[in-house]
Amino acid sequence: MSGSKSVSPPGYAAQTAASPAPRGGPEHRAAWGEADSRANGYPHAPGGSTRGSTKRSGGAVTPQQQQRLASRWRGGDDDEDPPLSGDDPLAGGFGFSFRSKSAWQERGGDDGGRGSRRQRRGAAGGGSTRAPPAGGSGSSAAAAAAAGGTEVRPRSVELGLEERRGKGRAAEELEPGTGIVEDGDGSEDGGSSVASGSGTGAVLSLGACCLALLQIFRSKKFPSDKLERLYQRYFFRLNQSSLTMLMAVLVLVCLVMLAFHAARPPLQIAYLAVLAAAVGVILIMAVLCNRAAFHQDHMGLACYALIAVVLAVQVVGLLLPQPRSASEGIWWTVFFIYTIYTLLPVRMRAAVLSGVLLSALHLAISLHTNSQDQFLLKQLVSNVLIFSCTNIVGVCTHYPAEVSQRQAFQETRECIQARLHSQRENQQQERLLLSVLPRHVAMEMKADINAKQEDMMFHKIYIQKHDNVSILFADIEGFTSLASQCTAQELVMTLNELFARFDKLAAENHCLRIKILGDCYYCVSGLPEARADHAHCCVEMGMDMIEAISLVREVTGVNVNMRVGIHSGRVHCGVLGLRKWQFDVWSNDVTLANHMEAGGKAGRIHITKATLNYLNGDYEVEPGCGGDRNAYLKEHSIETFLILSCTQKRKEEKAMIAKMNRQRTNSIGHNPPHWGAERPFYNHLGGNQVSKEMKRMGFEDPKDKNAQESANPEDEVDEFLGRAIDARSIDRLRSEHVRKFLLTFREPDLEKKYSKQVDDRFGAYVACASLVFLFICFVQITIVPHSLFMLSFYLSCFLLLALVVFVSVIYACVKLFPTPLQTLSRKIVRSKKNSTLVGVFTITLVFLSAFVNMFMCNSKNLVGCLAEEHNITVNQVNACHVMESAFNYSLGDEQGFCGSPQPNCNFPEYFTYSVLLSLLACSVFLQISCIGKLVLMLAIEFIYVLIVEVPGVTLFDNADLLVTANAIDFSNNGTSQCPEHATKVALKVVTPIIISVFVLALYLHAQQVESTARLDFLWKLQATEEKEEMEELQAYNRRLLHNILPKDVAAHFLARERRNDELYYQSCECVAVMFASIANFSEFYVELEANNEGVECLRLLNEIIADFDEIISEDRFRQLEKIKTIGSTYMAASGLNDSTYDKAGKTHIKAIADFAMKLMDQMKYINEHSFNNFQMKIGLNIGPVVAGVIGARKPQYDIWGNTVNVASRMDSTGVPDRIQVTTDMYQVLAANTYQLECRGVVKVKGKGEMMTYFLNGGPPLS
């Protein structure tokens, strides 16, 4: 077994309200850092150590590595508890000092180069710790890995112009085989995305770009219908708001159209009726869409009904009004097309079909009603260009917005998924953690990780004192015989099965299992919460254990029995040291309880007088005569008793309690908790059947257990997201976090985070705006007379825009270009200020190209010329005078009239339409704030309206006159009649109105886009923060667990839920085992009021063990694993896994020998500075062991085998201040020139006579 069962008095910190004890330094955080470093495959040495640690085959650790590690794991120093009360032994002249090596220093003397822990930390600057790799503890990677192949992520198709930039987070990396599929084809967008990590480049082939552009025009959806419905629910309220906004602007447009029609008589009833009906229908739909009964399924129906209304308005608006012109109705057609793309929540396919249908209707009706115009071809070509540009801009606006929304939804879902995964894993960690440590200890430790605490002279000691508890020790008598009949693996399985049963009994009897030492099991009742019936609980526990072992005896045929000893009194409980914490209890009463078990009888419960007094006569007893069987009991004159049976009164009470428990269980409506799906003594039964005796012990047949199938993680995420969508209130989020008009966050920190977001599609925005510029150029080249200025200006603008596009798109494939260009591109794209300036510059060039040719047109006033020709006043001129003019003025004549050398621009309304396109280009830049867009669009409107109304007013007046004359000529079919009713609304009146309508609609769209983006950012930020908090808690638990269990063992038990009988063990071929005990510590330990009832003695022991833990954490001892402490005995081993076992060089054996010598030196140092005379005995042995965990639900890692037993005997039979080794150990060390001497033959219990040796020193220095 793994060492002696004797438990020394030293204890655990009693932190009570009446007598709080001071806390030590922050080394427990270093302990967690070490555990996590080892978990990531990197060695760790605490920051305060300069004990000559050697580095792993690679020289010294750099200061940068030290700084990274220090900043990662040392968030701050630990807080100090309130100081000791007036009876502080340090203040009261207690006769010894309690400074460990990490804190002790000579006052004015020479420490031999050793400073205080604080000095060493300052000198080391973080210690010799090797920094872990970027990415930390790996919790995020674990969360990402949990998603596996089932996770659904949208694939980004960035308009075919740039790749998806890596965000540095696994949740944002796009993976092949996942993403958005095209609507209807059910296949994935295989080569449509270009994905790379941050800082990588990608070569975009022409075929890939074309394919990506084709994908843009196709509707996107998630492969999962359930996920797609969740996405629609996610944006339902925002879509409802967009739909309402669209209805409002459509009503406004219809009213403007009605006003224009009313301003040019004669009125047409059909036109008025259709538009009035359209307004009424839209208003009714708006009311219905904002009712509570309106839900997601109604959205599509409302959208398509609205498209039908728009198509009706389009047809009536083009067919009925007079005078007819191919340029009539372009502005509202552009408006309808663009708003369908941007404000109507429909799929891309529906939006494209609607836009094309509206364009085709306008072109067809224009061709039909204006077929006799000689200049119709130019107008139709220009109209095609305008509608094509509008559709493309609509696609370029709709697509990024939808992709952004889908990515925001998916990233939020991924955050929730990672959070739920972390939560599940954290719950598993919590269960595992709380099965090893009581809740109050574990919570205090985790709180200390977070707290920023001051550096203290002493290490933090986690200790509590409990005055009224009962301690039970139980040993299996005859276990040696049972063990001799099975292999080491079968022995571990037997222990696991038996002690799992004892753990269940302990829970039922309100006892807390403390530790398992070999075949010894001890527990305490009254911890952590006090109980008045603690003695009864321990006695009942002892009876159940004896009954359980009797059934084991029946099943196995081996004469095994339980020897139980119980004592009631006071304990100190908690953990000692910095590594591999195990909850334990210490006190003189614990020592007495241990001897009560040793002096007891098989199959009987041996109690002291103190325990008997707590039983209140509920049990019949007889004298125990423990002093006859145990020297300790005899020496201290302990009166003992043996339990005979329960009294009748106690039996009735137990029956009543059992009945109440059954009634309580039945009222809850489920079966009482059972002890898992255990298969105890499976090897002895030879099958899956559970015998009658086993059922009597409480073990259940696996077939009888109702296995609970774990929910699908994907379904759990979707269900959680659905609840969150239903619970969130967009209006509340807006009012609480976002200013109403400016749409900025109320909290400056949120605004700062939002402003730092990088929009990777900026190059696509610039490219789209440049495309608008090209369309404007083609429109004006088609409809406006050519000039040298036009050619030179457009060529200059094209070169400038091409340069801007080139620099912006470099960001998507940086490695293909020189470093200066890469730097310039990053500075533009990654800076919101720079990208906004570049966007404004691009929009300015597009706007200038829309109207600059106006200044090259004939600015003579046609009305004045006609008045002069007909000798009438200007007010008397009308369209009929144009027809009667000798100069034959017409819309198709580009020759300058009135003697002007400049050509006529007879269609100035196309300048206005070009300006409308430039406004659409403004809306493409999604990264520009809505207020910025509003200011920019108002500036464009002001400048253009000013030009129209002042220098260009004659251009528009001339066009109005010519259009009216052309319509009259067309309606009269060449006759000389001139009806006076042929009028139209002046372009100089129409232009400001339609531009204002566009500015309003584009501002509302910009506000909607930004509001959506900010709310998505806010919700994703909240989900991310919750996920990070969960991951932070998970990291705390993981570091704490790795400081309790080896990392591979912890990972095994965290992988999934384990049954109590599931066994974890591994056979190790050649392990070096060390037991190091402070031989005379029991003499030092006393419980006096002056030393806080022994707490200060335990504080010194904690300092000693902490120093040992710091030594074992050094890099040169990375092959060693601390197993546990048993009182004042320190147990360690090396070579327990492939990474620490050196079969050829035996370095793990030499490492444990060096470690043993280092402990001897450290103890001398402690004695020198604490004015004590502690004597250490160390035993070493090598050989095969079995390493494993007993109890899957309450795991305890240990090693077993003959090698462990002999190593323990080397310690117990050793000589103070010497290191005793076996012959096997001697042969390995002697071969490596270690200095040893032969002690001779030593009589070892259970082994007979053995030849042993003393280790005196390491290899001589060469």
Swiss-Prot record:
**Stretches of the chain found on the membrane's Cytoplasmic side:** 1-196, 396-763, 1006-1262
Sites binding Mg(2+) 2 sit at D475, I476, D519
Ribonucleoprotein recorded as keyword = no
Residue positions annotated to bind Mg(2+) 1 are D475, D519
Entry's transmembrane regions? 197-217, 243-263, 269-289, 300-320, 326-346, 375-395, 764-784, 790-810, 837-857, 911-931, 936-956, 985-1005
Query: Which reactions does this protein catalyse?
Result: ATP = 3',5'-cyclic AMP + diphosphate
Instruction: List residues binding ATP.
Output: 475-480, 517-519, 563, 1124, 1198-1200, 1205-1209, 1245
Q: Which cysteines are joined by disulfide bonds?
A: none
Recorded GO molecular functions are: adenylate cyclase activity; adenylate cyclase binding; ATP binding; metal ion binding; scaffold protein binding
Cofactor stoichiometry and binding? Binds 2 magnesium ions per subunit. Is also active with manganese (in vitro).
Q: How is it modified after translation?
A: Phosphorylated by RAF1.
Segments on the Extracellular side according to the record's topology features: 858-910
Regulation acting on activity, per entry: Activated by G(s) G alpha protein GNAS. Inhibited by G(i) G alpha protein GNAI1. Activity is further increased by interaction with the G-protein beta and gamma subunit complex formed by GNB1 and GNG2. Activated by forskolin. Is not activated by calmodulin. Inhibited by adenosine and ATP analogs. Inhibited by calcium ions, already at micromolar concentrations. Phosphorylation by RAF1 results in its activation.
Q: Which InterPro entries is this protein grouped with?
A: A/G_cyclase, A/G_cyclase_CS, AC_N, Adcy, Adcy_conserved_dom, Nucleotide_cyclase
Which PROSITE patterns does its entry note? Answer: GUANYLATE_CYCLASE_1, GUANYLATE_CYCLASE_2
Q: Does the keyword Transcription regulation apply?
A: no
In this chain, composition skew of type Basic and acidic residues spans 25-37, 152-172
Q: Which residues carry this modification: Omega-N-methylarginine?
A: R23
What domain of life?
Eukaryota
Map out region (Disordered) in residue numbers: 1-194
Per the UniProt annotation, where are the glycans attached? N239, N834, N871, N888, N973
The entry sums up its family as follows: Belongs to the adenylyl cyclase class-4/guanylyl cyclase family.
According to the UniProt entry, the note on domains is: The protein contains two modules with six transmembrane helices each; both are required for catalytic activity. Isolated N-terminal or C-terminal guanylate cyclase domains have no catalytic activity, but when they are brought together, enzyme activity is restored. The active site is at the interface of the two domains. Both contribute substrate-binding residues, but the catalytic metal ions are bound exclusively via the N-terminal guanylate cyclase domain.
Protein name in the entry: Adenylate cyclase type 5
- Organism, per UniProt? Mus musculus
